[in-house]
Amino acid sequence: MMARCRREGPILILQDTTGFIYSRAHPGKIGFTKTINAGRYKAGQLNVQTLCGVLMHSSLAVTLTGTPLGLAAVKFWTRRKYKGTLALKRHVNPTRVPIETKESYRWLENLRQSIALVGAPERCVHVGDRESDIYEL
C-alpha cells in the first residue's frame, strides 16, 4: 500500500466503525456491542436483546477518483458490557474524562497510524461521520 500512496495528489482516509454480530449460547465470552428492542412478548412486555460480537474501526485509503489503495489502520475491540451514552452521561461528565480512556480514542489512533503509514500528512484528508466530531481530532 505504501508504494501506491507515494503517487502524487491527495489521499482520502475514510474512517468508520462496524460490528460483527454473532449469536452464541454464552454471549458474554465474545463481548457486547449493543442492546436492541426486539419487539414485545405476547404478554406485552418488551423483548430487549443484547447483541454480542466484535467491533472494528478501519481507515480505508482511496484516491480522489475512488480507487482503493488499501487499509491504512484497523482496530478491533469488544465491550465487557454495553451502556448507552445517555446512561453514561448520567454518572460521568464526558468532558472531564481523558480522551485516552474513551472508546472514541480509536479515531485518533487510526489517524496517527494512517499518517505514519502514508508518510506524508499534508496529503491526507481524513473523512469521518459525526461520531468523529471530537475536540481532540
Regions found by a protein language model. Name each.
Residues 1-137:
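Conserved, well-structured functional cores that handle cations and Mg-NTP chemistry
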